[in-house]
Amino acid sequence: MRSVVAGVLLPVLVVVLIGPYTFLPSLLEYAVARDVKARLGIEKQPYVELKSDPPLRMLAGEFSGGRIVMKNTDLGNVTATRARIDLDPFDIDVWATMRKGQVVDRDPLSGDVRVDVPEWEVSRLAKAGSEIPIQDVDVQKDGVVVRSEVSVLGRRFPASIEGEPGLRDGELIFQPQGLTAAGVQVPDELADRLLAGTSFEYPLDRLPYQTTITGVEAEEGRIMLSGSVPSIPLGAYPGG
């Protein structure tokens, strides 16, 4: 009799213990990807990878981190070729998740974000936020070159304005630092007068998930925005 009971209970116990370990990561990754896709209205489902270290901790709903990667997507008012969120450690309610069939997290996810903004998008942002006409933008490793025009003695000359991207009050800004007009380097004092009003600002307040951008860096052909994401809700909440 005992052998029969053991033969019945053992497979059940194995399923109870191994089931969450086997299916929970895929279920959670799918739920996160589906939620991000739906909330952002993007065409392609993002890549999601979640980690638990050691792996057995996921049975208690404890995850050490993970990442969410989106490619060629519109993040509010900025188009990115790639956006990556590195997740902070988080917990989920394992049994509520298994019972409901969708993820039940104890708190929204959070993490650090890096956004690749391509040169053509930087050019679009510059044109949208500038008071002067801009023909083109060249993003280089050591800064940004904006091609425009300056007015000297009533005549307009092609100009290359050198500077660096930065942040101020939640806006992406460009601060001019040097000027070349008609192929000639303009002295700093004159350049300061000619460059008055040539800086541009572009708001970043429409990024999803209350994202806060705290850093910007120019690289060859792109700028990198970095910051934090404080709240990425999942499919359901306890009692929800």
Where are the regions that the model predicts?
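Hydrophobic membrane/lipid-contacting segments
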Residues: 83-92, 133-189, 223, 228-230
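Short amphipathic beta-strand and strand-loop transition segments with alternating hydrophobic
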Residues: 50, 135-137, 164, 214-217
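Hydrophobic membrane-targeting and insertion signals
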Residues: 1-53, 57-60, 74-77, 235-240
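Small-residue helix/turn framework positions
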Residues: 97, 106-129, 163-197
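Extracytoplasmic/luminal low-complexity segments enriched in Pro/Gly and acidic/polar residues
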Residues: 186-240
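N-terminal beta-strand/beta-hairpin edge segment
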Residues: 43-123, 127-151
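A generic structural micro-feature
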Residues: 60-62, 155-157, 194, 208
